[in-house]
Curated annotation (Swiss-Prot):
Organism listed in the record: Ehrlichia chaffeensis (strain ATCC CRL-10679 / Arkansas)
CDD domains: SmpB (cd09294)
HAMAP family: SmpB
Origin superkingdom: Bacteria
Protein name: SsrA-binding protein
Record GO biological process: trans-translation
Family statement: Belongs to the SmpB family.
Lineage, broadest ranks: Bacteria, Pseudomonadati, Pseudomonadota, Alphaproteobacteria, Rickettsiales
Described function: Required for rescue of stalled ribosomes mediated by trans-translation. Binds to transfer-messenger RNA (tmRNA), required for stable association of tmRNA with ribosomes. tmRNA and SmpB together mimic tRNA shape, replacing the anticodon stem-loop with SmpB. tmRNA is encoded by the ssrA gene; the 2 termini fold to resemble tRNA(Ala) and it encodes a 'tag peptide', a short internal open reading frame. During trans-translation Ala-aminoacylated tmRNA acts like a tRNA, entering the A-site of stalled ribosomes, displacing the stalled mRNA.
Compartment list: Cytoplasm
Entry-linked SUPFAM superfamilies: Small protein B (SmpB)
Pfam family, one: SmpB
Length: 149
C-alpha cells in the first residue's frame, strides 16, 4: 500500500466512527498527478446525490505533460462502494453531527487508486485539549522509561 497523501487533521479534529475503503473514478492525467503526489485532501468531503457518493473539493493539480485538454482540479469525483456501504454512509450524512471525510488516498498492491473515507463526529475544544494531554503524557512516559531527560 503506497500512501499518496494523508489528512492528519482528521484524527485531531474528529472522533472516527467507522472506516471504508472506496475506489475513485479518475481520468488519466489525474492518476499521473497522483503518482507525482500533487494532491491536497485538506478541504475534501463526501456528499450524496442520487444514491451515489461524490468526493468534493479534492484538489488534484493539473498534469504538466498533458495536452491542452487537462482536467478540472477540483471537480467532484465519484466513489465506488458496495450498495450496503453506500446506504450506511448516506444515512450517516443525513444525521446531525456526523460527516464523512477522506482520511487518506493511496494506491493498493495492484496499483489502483483508493481512498479511505471515514464517518466522523466533531470534537469539542476540551476533547482536543485532552488529546494533546494524553499525547504529551505518553511521550513523557516513554522518555522516562528510556532513562532520558
Amino acid at each position: 500500500m503506497d500512501i499518496v497523501v494523508e489528512n492528519r487533521k482528521v484524527r485531531f479534529n474528529y472522533f472516527i466512527i467507522q472506516e471504508f475503503d472506496a475506489g475513485i473514478v479518475l481520468i488519466g492525467s489525474e492518476v499521473k498527478s497522483l503518482r507525482q503526489r500533487k494532491v491536497s485532501i485538506a478541504e475534501a468531503y463526501v456528499t450524496e446525490r442520487n444514491m451515489e457518493l461524490w468526493l468534493c473539493n479534492l484538489h488534484i493539480s493539473e498534469y504538466n505533460q498533458a495536452s491542452t485538454r487537462n482536467h478540472n482540479p477540483t471537480r467532484p469525483r465519484k466513489l465506488l462502494l458496495r450498495k450496503k456501504q453506500i446506504y450506511k454512509i448516506s444515512g450517516n450524512i443525513k444525521n446531525d453531527g456526523f460527516t464523512v471525510v477522506p482520511l487518506c488516498l493511496y494506491f493498493n498492491d495492484k496499483g489502483i487508486a483508493k481512498v479511505k473515507v471515514v464517518i466522523v463526529k466533531g470534537k469539542k475544544l476540551h476533547d482536543k485539549r485532552e488529546t494533546i494531554k494524553t499525547r504529551d503524557w505518553n511521550r513523557e512516559k516513554s522518555r522516562i522509561l528510556r532513562g532520558g531527560n
